[in-house]
């Protein structure tokens, strides 16, 4: 049975509210902390680094907790609701730091930021873990996933466009109050969209059903071992890490490249101007693309398009050409590639969940998506590390004309490093990734037959609302 439009739109609306709420943190929290609250850049940078390290530990543990959950509402929906409500509260507190001073302010900022990351993880992991439970059909997933990816991207563009005007209009000179009030708008959308998702999106092929209900719960140590035994998940994580490092290097370093190498920072907005539209358009036409082209071709496109973007920027720098149209084209190529990557990645993680059940007879949706989330955050951290390392090695000095050697080093950061990582994703995919064509069809047929033989699992009415099975292995 095909997925209804109501399900697709409800899942997409949930992604909109979720990313509407997170967008203000990714885009404006640094500005809020430094320019509104008055914290030092060093303190904020250290806090962000510590939070990413904690995420690397926290995300898989949260995935394990979700995987061990059994409830009358399924294994994911309770955590989506809990995560939404707690993250909404913490989001409001996050932008209330301007109300404190001195040591109390620093402590408040550190505690609320760490709590924000933890509560968002509670919601985000089970939200994306719904994908492999909605359908086992390859084509249906390819029709489903563009909806949440499109709405998530749209939320980011809306956040970028309306945040500062809202803050100025409502807060006036008191920007802290403006930010605080804007979080209430975000929270309203966040909670409303989550309710729509919970009402209309259903777990059909979850590991919390009659097929797996009688199996013993897995310890955290066993779960970590299963990640390595699922060779296709390991391969996908390697590809995702390489891709995220490359794209984060470009996103984080582009302003430096335009300022010093191309020599005109005013051209940077052209690089971004049509990129968002290209991203959204790619997500809209993805269902048609995947009918016309194989996933192998689309993955190649996801990796090659950003390489062409880098090559275009490199050629303009060498020829000393300042052409807005070429810069717009470079931004479009980059965003077409990244849009393809993000939608393919979500689908492919779902495929590795099916593969794990096919090969190991164990279905762990939340574990797969938790380690995928960890890899995305790791990619951001590694990218920042590479940028800082190379800038130090090449003798970069801010706000002055750079030497020829430094400019060459900047080209290495912006062009060579990303291209190497993008090429790595291609090599890993075509050499080691096998979940395509006949292999995927074989897995789908096997699992459909398996789930048809066992009716959906239903909790008894008198069972506990949420039961998380703990084990002595949690420290593993």
Swiss-Prot record:
Q: Where in the cell is it found?
A: Cell inner membrane
Q: Which Gene Ontology CC terms are recorded?
A: plasma membrane
Outcome of residue 59 to C?
Alters cation selectivity. Retains only a low level of H(+)-coupled melibiose binding and active transport, but Na(+) or Li(+) does not stimulate either binding or transport
What changing residue 58 to C does, per the record, is: Alters cation selectivity. Decreases H(+)- and Na(+)-coupled activity, with little effect on Li(+)-coupled melibiose transport
Describe what happens upon changing residue 18 to C.
Loss of transporter activity
Annotated phenotype, changing residue 124 to C? Alters cation selectivity. Loss of transporter activity
Outcome reported for the amino acid change (mutating residue 55 to C): Alters cation selectivity. Retains a low level of H(+)-coupled melibiose transport, but retains only a weak activity with Na(+) or Li(+)
Q: Name one GO molecular function term.
A: symporter activity
Q: Which Pfam families match?
A: MFS_2 (PF13347)
Q: Which residues cross the membrane?
A: 8-30, 42-66, 77-97, 105-129, 144-167, 178-200, 233-255, 267-289, 297-318, 324-349, 367-394, 409-431
Q: What biological processes does GO assign it?
A: carbohydrate transport; sodium ion transport; transmembrane transport
Keywords (alphabetical) are: Cell inner membrane, Cell membrane, Membrane, Sugar transport, Symport, Transmembrane, Transmembrane helix, Transport
Mapped to this chain, the residue ranges on the Cytoplasmic side of the membrane are: 1-7, 67-76, 130-143, 201-232, 290-296, 350-366, 432-476
- Catalytic activity annotation: melibiose(in) + Na(+)(in) = melibiose(out) + Na(+)(out); melibiose(in) + Li(+)(in) = melibiose(out) + Li(+)(out); melibiose(in) + H(+)(in) = melibiose(out) + H(+)(out)
Chief location bin = membrane
User: What happens after mutating residue 123 to C?
Assistant: Does not affect transporter activity
Impact after mutating residue 19 to C? Loss of transporter activity
Which residues bind an alpha-D-galactoside per the record? 18-19, 124, 128, 149
Anything known on activity regulation? Binding of Na(+) and melibiose is cooperative, the binding affinity for one substrate is increased by the presence of the other. With binding of one substrate (either Na(+) or melibiose), MelB favors open conformations (likely outward facing), whereas the cooperative binding of both substrates induces cavity closure. Thus, cooperative binding is the key that regulates the alternating-access process and ensures the obligatory cotransport as the core mechanism for symport. Melibiose uptake is inhibited by valinomycin.
Q: Which family does it belong to?
A: Belongs to the sodium:galactoside symporter (TC 2.A.2) family.
Please provide the record's free-text comment about the domains of this protein: Apoprotein is apparently conformationally labile and readily converts to different states, including inward-facing conformations for substrate access. Contains a conserved cation-binding pocket, which directly connects to the sugar specificity pocket.
This chain's protein is named: Melibiose permease
Q: Which organism is it from?
A: Salmonella typhimurium (strain LT2 / SGSC1412 / ATCC 700720)
């Amino acid at each position: 049975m095909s997925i209804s439009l109501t399900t697709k739109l409800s899942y997409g609306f949930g992604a909109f509210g979720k990313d509407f709420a997170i967008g203000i943190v990714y885009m404006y929290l640094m500005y809020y902390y430094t320019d509104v609250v008055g914290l030092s850049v060093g303190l904020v940078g250290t806090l962000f680094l510590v939070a990413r390290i904690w995420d690397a530990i926290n995300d898989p543990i949260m995935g394990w907790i979700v995987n061990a959950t059994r409830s009358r509402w399924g294994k994911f929906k309770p955590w989506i609701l809990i995560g939404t409500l707690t993250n909404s509260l913490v989001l409001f507190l996050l932008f209330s730091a301007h109300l404190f001073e001195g040591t109390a302010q620093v402590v408040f900022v550190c505690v609320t930021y760490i709590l924000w990351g933890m509560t968002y993880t509670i919601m985000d992991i089970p939200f994306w873990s719904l994908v492999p439970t909605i359908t086992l059909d390859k084509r249906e997933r390819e029709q489903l996933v563009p909806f949440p990816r499109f709405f998530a991207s749209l939320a980011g563009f809306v956040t970028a466009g309306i945040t500062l005007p809202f803050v100025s209009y409502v807060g006036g000179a008191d920007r802290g109050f403006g930010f605080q009030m804007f979080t209430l708008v975000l929270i309203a959308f966040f909670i409303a969209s989550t309710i729509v998702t919970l009402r209309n999106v259903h777990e059909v092929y979850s590991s919390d059903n009659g097929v797996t209900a009688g199996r013993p719960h897995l310890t955290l140590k066993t779960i970590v071992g299963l990640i390595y035994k699922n060779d296709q998940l390991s391969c996908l994580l390697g590809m995702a890490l390489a891709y995220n490092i490359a794209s984060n290097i470009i996103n984080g370093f582009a302003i430096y490249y335009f300022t010093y190498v191309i020599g005109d920072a005013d051209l940077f907005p052209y690089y971004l101007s049509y990129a968002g539209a290209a991203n959204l358009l790619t997500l809209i036409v993805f269902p048609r693309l995947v009918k016309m082209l194989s996933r192998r071709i689309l993955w190649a496109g996801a990796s090659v398009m950003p390489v062409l973007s880098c090559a275009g920027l490199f050629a303009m720098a060498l020829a000393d050409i300042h052409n807005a149209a070429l810069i717009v084209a470079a931004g479009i190529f980059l965003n077409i590639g990244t849009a393809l990557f993000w939608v393919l990645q979500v689908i492919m993680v779902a495929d590795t969940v099916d593969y794990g059940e096919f090969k190991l007879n164990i279905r762990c949706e939340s574990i797969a998506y938790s380690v995928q989330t960890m890899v995305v955050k790791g990619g951001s951290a590694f990218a920042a590390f590479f940028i800082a390392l190379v800038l130090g090695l090449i003798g970069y000095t801010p706000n002055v004309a750079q030497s020829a050697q430094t400019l060459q080093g900047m080209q290495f950061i912006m062009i060579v490093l990303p291209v190497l990582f993008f090429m790595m994703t291609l090599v890993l995919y075509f050499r080691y990734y096998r979940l395509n064509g006949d292999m995927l069809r074989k897995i789908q047929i096997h699992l459909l037959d398996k789930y048809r033989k066992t009716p959906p699992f239903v909790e008894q009415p008198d069972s506990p609302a949420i039961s998380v099975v703990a084990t002595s292995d949690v420290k593993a």
